[in-house]
Amino acid sequence: MKIVSVILAVALGAGNPAWAQDTSELQLVKRVFEQLQPISISKNREYCGYIGRDAAGNVAFTKARRGRKGTCVPRDPDALAVVTASYHTHGAYSPNYVNELPSVEDMEGDEAEGIDGWVATPGGRLWYVDTQEMTIHLICDLGCLPADPAFVEGDTGEILPSYRYKALVQKIEAVGG
């Protein structure tokens, strides 16, 4: 999938990719999460929506919807001509959740909708969920986005830069998720 290659190239410092529309999605995602993360953390709720293209072909996003602890269902993406991905936050840090990784349910939900996903974590990580390959990719690490001051680094153990579906299931089960 082209967007994953572009995003990984940006994340790995490979310079400016040729597809500006894909880097514009990444830039938009970061701006959206920079605004949502502090609210999500302070209210300890997930916030979610969709990203895609409007009728003019511009990268756009739907208004974020407030969810609950551990879940969020976005509004219908009527304003988007094409939906490319979901986005959501994971709320405040909690030792009771494996919230530094996209969940298996996050990945399965995006796959069921036929789209990819973006996930922001309480530690300030940004993840990309590629449902065509059923992998998650760490786009930027701790503190890349606003982080919960109560976040405890390392409570989920070592976080790898990517996971395939089966490895994600195993990781979450191993840490008690």
Locate the predicted segments by residue:
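Bacterial N-terminal signal peptides
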Residues: K2-G15
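General alpha-helical segment detector with a strong preference for membrane-spanning helices
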Residues: V6, R53, A92-S94
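A generic structural signal for short, solvent-exposed coil/turn residues
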Residues: L12, S42, R53, D78, ...
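Small side chains
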Residues: G13-G15, G52, G117
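Sec/Tat signal peptide C-region and signal peptidase I cleavage site
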Residues: N16-A20
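Active-site-proximal loop/helix of nucleotide/amide-processing enzymes and allied scaffolds
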Residues: Q21-D22, C72-A85, T89-G177
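N-terminal secretory signal peptides
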Residues: Q21-R68, V73
